[in-house]
Structure formats: structure tokens, C-alpha cells
């Protein structure tokens, strides 16, 4: 059996552009792609924290260090500039691989620069 686990996440990034007439995708600062291990043209899930929208598209590389987080094409209809989003990618793996797998979690500041990284999420307490 194979499991689908969170491979990488960019947490609470700010949408910088919404380009309806650009070829569909999400353009992500190249430094964030490198930090997460998300590959160009890889499928990603977008969860808009601001409005609750959830959809998928594919990642393309934006200029390194630019802070760009641009939703393009049809995806642009689901967000507005200034919205907070989570970008997530998943990977399929065996149960044995899953036992030792750790996701790349990247947390950003208001300018979409990396504030810190982690490989686990703290346990939620009551």
C-alpha cells in the first residue's frame, strides 16, 4: 500500500499578484521552491486562509528573493492580492518510507521571506 503524505508546505504566504491573463499556475519565489523541494511544474494545493478557497495548480519559478507569490490564469479568480495562503505538495510513498519521512515546512514573514523552517508540526493541545 502507498500513502500520500505532506511533502512540503509554505505556511501563510502573502499573495503578491493575481494575473488572470497569465498562463495558469502559481509563480513562487525560487528560494522558497528550493527550501521546500517543490519542483517546477509540480502539482501543488493552495489553501486560502483569508477566504477559505481550496484548489490545485502547478508551481513555476519566480525570481529568487523576489517574494513573489502570484496566482495566474483561472487560479487568479480564487484569491486577491494580500490574501494569506498555504501552498502544499504531497508525495506517494510506501508504509516503510513513511515511517522515517519528514516534510519540509517553510514559514515566511509578511514579505514572503523565510522566517524559519521545520520538519514537524507541534502537537495541538486542548
Swiss-Prot record:
Subcellular localization: Cytoplasm
Functional pathway: Cofactor biosynthesis; (R)-pantothenate biosynthesis; beta-alanine from L-aspartate: step 1/1
Annotated EC: 4.1.1.11
Post-translational modification: Is synthesized initially as an inactive proenzyme, which is activated by self-cleavage at a specific serine bond to produce a beta-subunit with a hydroxyl group at its C-terminus and an alpha-subunit with a pyruvoyl group at its N-terminus.
Active site: 25, 58
Primary location group: cytoplasm
Catalysed conversion reaction: L-aspartate + H(+) = beta-alanine + CO2
Binding site for substrate: 57, 73-75
UniProt modified residues of type Pyruvic acid (Ser): 25
UniProt GO BP: alanine biosynthetic process; pantothenate biosynthetic process
Superkingdom field: Bacteria
Subunit structure comment from the entry: Heterooctamer of four alpha and four beta subunits.
Protein name (Swiss-Prot/TrEMBL): Aspartate 1-decarboxylase
Organism expressing this protein natively: Xanthomonas axonopodis pv. citri (strain 306)
Gene name in the database record: panD
Amino acid at each position: 500500500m502507498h500513502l500520500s503524505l505532506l511533502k512540503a508546505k509554505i505556511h501563510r504566504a502573502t499573495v503578491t499578484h493575481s494575473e488572470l491573463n497569465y498562463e495558469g499556475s502559481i509563480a513562487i519565489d525560487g528560494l522558497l521552491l528550493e527550501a521546500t523541494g517543490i519542483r517546477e511544474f509540480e502539482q501543488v494545493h493552495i489553501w486560502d486562509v483569508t477566504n477559505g478557497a481550496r484548489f490545485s495548480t502547478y508551481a513555476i519559478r519566480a525570481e529568487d528573493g523576489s517574494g513573489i507569490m502570484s496566482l495566474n490564469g483561472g487560479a487568479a479568480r480564487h484569491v486577491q492580492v494580500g490574501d494569506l495562503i498555504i501552498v502544499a505538495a504531497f508525495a506517494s510513498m510506501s508504509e516503510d518510507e513513511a515511517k522515517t519521512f519528514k516534510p519540509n515546512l517553510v514559514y515566511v514573514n509578511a514579505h514572503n521571506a523565510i522566517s524559519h523552517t521545520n520538519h514537524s508540526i507541534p502537537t495541538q493541545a486542548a
